[in-house]
Regions:
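Alpha-helical substrate-recognition element adjacent to the catalytic core
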Residues: 1-82
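Mg2+-dependent phosphoryl-transfer enzymes with acidic/Ser/Thr/Gly-rich catalytic loops
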Residues: 28-34, 70-74, 84-134
Length: 134
């Protein structure tokens, strides 16, 4: 039997490359807090697999887009209601490693080639993941 090699590493932005905080002022959402080491790690990984980001945060999408593009990657706004179907149609979930922490990410994780949840993800998401970071 031929072993399948994943072609894509798809990461959900909020809670994966951010600490989940969204900082507001009286005018609305202004800031998200991103980890500083993500860029270096993903720069190494992108030599071996295509790295892409998704976000369902419509209000904060410009913030996420700026950070992801500064790191040299692509990002797509995908609301959770259509994410699984869109990813399967455009990438084929069996070709994807998926990393997420959100309430509906477990649905994608169950169909992906391999799935990762960051430490602190929701319990049912961690149970669906092949690996939980430490």
């Amino acid at each position: 039997m031929k072993k399948i090699k994943p072609k894509y590493f798809i990461l959900d932005v909020d809670g994966v490359i951010t600490d989940g905080q969204m900082i507001y002022d009286k005018y609305g959402k202004k800031y998200k807090v991103f980890g500083q080491d993500d860029h270096d790690s993903l720069k190494v990984i992108k030599k071996y697999i295509k790295v892409c980001f998704v976000s369902g945060d419509k209000v904060g999408f410009k913030i996420s887009k700026k950070r992801v593009e500064d790191m040299g990657f692509e990002i797509k706004y995908l609301p959770v209601e259509i994410r699984e179907k869109w990813l399967n149609k455009n990438f084929g979930l069996k070709n994807c490693i998926y990393m997420g922490d959100g309430i509906f990410d477990h649905l994608i994780m169950k169909k992906a080639y391999y799935s990762i949840a960051p430490m602190g993800a929701l319990n049912h998401v961690c149970k669906s993941a092949n690996y939980v970071t430490k």
